[in-house]
Amino acid sequence: MHYSALHRYTSYMNNTPTLYLPAHVTRYVTMKSGDRLALTKTIRANHRFIASRATWGGRTVFCKQPQAGMTGADELTREVEGLVAFNQFARDVAIPFCVPRLLYHDDSLLVTTFVDGYQTSMYTVPPEFWVRSFVAMDRYFRQPVRRLPRWARPSRRGRYIWEDMEYGVRKTAEWAIYPGLLADCLAYLRRYATALEARPMHADFTDGNTMFDNKNYWVIDFESFRPDWPRWYDVVNFTYNRMITRPEVTDQMQLILSQTVKQLGESPTTAHEIRFSAIMRGLSFLIEGTTPGGKGHASTNWISEERRYRVVQSLRFLVSGGDLTKM
């Protein structure tokens, strides 16, 4: 391990950021429309957003505000676009979940209907819910003309995704992965980027963003929504992440992934598309686990040696052509 990389990692570990958990928030927020929103309870707060229960026009609503300097109009814009797209989805198709209704938004505030429920757990939600949801989303958001996702195109900075990933790993996580394995991962991303297909996608469709009100499931938090995520990303993000963080549910995750693929049908590029997203998630684990949460990502969990080992082993398996449903 290089001393400089170890020193950076040790410094981060010794200076873990404290989440911003205010004892109270501003009692009233003035909307650009001139209305006033009364904030009655902070539901959750981190370094990116403050989410509150509020009262507006005599009814209880949900309010989301970005933290100054961390998030801004682009994240709220994506959330608005996601809420609009998924509300239309819910109206057009019989799906196993509901979506909050967008009531108001500007560049510093988002208001939706309030979901009076509790966050679900993967241990309480049946696998069939996830399979039905992933299949329904894929079919509904399928595009009439195949197009490449943003990961297959240069960014606004003129870099491809594998160049960004190499930069991120070498900056803070170079010590966490063998140089040859990193090179193999980057080569895979370069080779198969054009095999990807774009889809509008929630991109964080997980138990952490699913609530239950004793009658219906509700999907929330659309800040990661984009119209050009790679197909399969949502199901890989859900299943692969849990294979790494909760290995005891690996069999269940592999069942969800395999059933989703079976119902949608495989194409000649399906295996590469799934592998591509899993490799991206593996490298992201290393980057997110060695940098403090901020504008680049929301994670605040530092990677343990056990988790790092699982990530590295999974990347070895994937670049050698392994099937994620059998990992």
Where in the sequence are the language-model features?
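ATP-binding glycine-rich loop module of kinase domains
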Residues: H47-R78
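Short beta-strand micro-motifs within the conserved protein kinase catalytic domain, predominantly
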Residues: P96-L109
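Conserved short submotifs of the Hanks-type protein kinase catalytic core
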Residues: D107-Q119
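Catalytic activation segment of kinase domains across protein kinase-like and atypical kinase folds
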Residues: G208-V236
